[in-house]
Amino acid sequence: MTFKEKEAAYLSRWKTTVNEAVWDYCDRHGIRRPNRCTTVQPAGTKSLLTGAAPGWHPPKAQRFIRRITFRKNDPVALACLDYGYSIVPSQSDKDEQGRLLDDPFDSRCTEWLVEIPTEVSWANLPGADQVEINNFSAMAQFDFYMQVQQHYTAHNTSATIEFREHEIESLSEAIHTCIGEGKGYISAALLLSLIHI
């Protein structure tokens, strides 16, 4: 059995387990069964507080600053401030000359960005610092996305595929083939990488 076959079996097993558990719970409590139980689609920036990834794609770094949007004076944002997290005005809050505000307590400020230092779960594993995340090819990312799309989720999987200019043709052919053969492709965000240009 190849790695992809093992991965597909693993994802399918978890999809079945999740569906059976949710349906059993709904049936026991007289609740209508949902039409989607397996999702990879965080809803809003506050879901990121739980450590959820913003989609089914590899992070761009092992450690980074995650900015989460809150309305000004939101109780959770104020709690973050009390715990020492940095708060900056939203990118949409500007002065009369169109310049970004720099004081989150300015009366013109309507939203806050709470800056939370974040690291991926595997950041401190031996050898993790030698993984160059930006070297994943577009086809590797697409394959990773399609495995989850085909064998786990019951709708569109939220994913961003970063590609380089020389990968456009092979990626577009792979997408076209998946659509033509009914393999479950719905959509993915495509982002041109400017790192190697």
Spell out what each predicted region is.
Residues K15, P42, L49-I195:
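Catalytic alpha/beta core of large soluble enzyme barrels
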Residues M1-Q41:
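Internal maturation/activation junctions in enzymes
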Residues N35, L48-L49:
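Short capping micro-motif at the N-terminus of alpha-helices
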